[in-house]
Curated annotation (Swiss-Prot):
Keyword Lipid metabolism among record annotations: no
Keywords for the protein's UniProt record, in alphabetical order: Cytoplasm, DNA-binding, Repeat, Transcription, Transcription regulation
Lineage: Bacteria, Bacillati, Mycoplasmatota, Mycoplasmoidales, Metamycoplasmataceae
HAMAP family membership: MraZ (MF_01008)
SUPFAM superfamilies xrefs: AbrB/MazE/MraZ-like
GO-annotated cellular components: cytoplasm; nucleoid
Gene Ontology MF term list: DNA-binding transcription factor activity; transcription cis-regulatory region binding
Similarity comment: Belongs to the MraZ family.
Subunit field text: Forms oligomers.
Location in or out of the cell: Cytoplasm, Nucleoid
Organism whose genome encodes this protein: Metamycoplasma arthritidis (strain 158L3-1) (Mycoplasma arthritidis)
This protein's name: Transcriptional regulator MraZ
Residue stretches making up the SpoVT-AbrB domain: 4-46, 75-118
Pfam families: MraZ
Amino acid sequence: MYGKFCRQLDDKNRIVIPTKFLRDLGEEFYITAGFDQALVLRSEAEFEKFKAKLEATNKLNKNMRELTRYIFANTEEVKSDRLGRITLPKHFLDNFTITKEIVFIGSGNYCELFAKEIYDKKEAQFKDAKKIDELADELFKNGIEL
């Protein structure tokens, strides 16, 4: 998935999923707590792969147990209605400071959902060409050539 879309919550905490993403996610999909104050939306198939990786982690490692517990406790299976809307659970709204405006961004095989205020701060770093060069250098150091 790729692209960026802005949406607004309605009074019933419903949000319209961008059609482009809904095609990949399917009618029923999963929302999980992500990193960087984002929620992550995954298709059922992608969620099963993700779940298998989490379940295969070393349970003797306390940090892995805690992170796995946190992610599974903050996972919801959702189903879109005929208008492509889902209702965001209150705990997601509270924990991820989502009020009204939301930004969906494609992140490869999943999409992320941010409160607009949070995403705007993250995107601002890319207005600095030096920062982009630093991040590109990190990719290169990790074996990814652009």
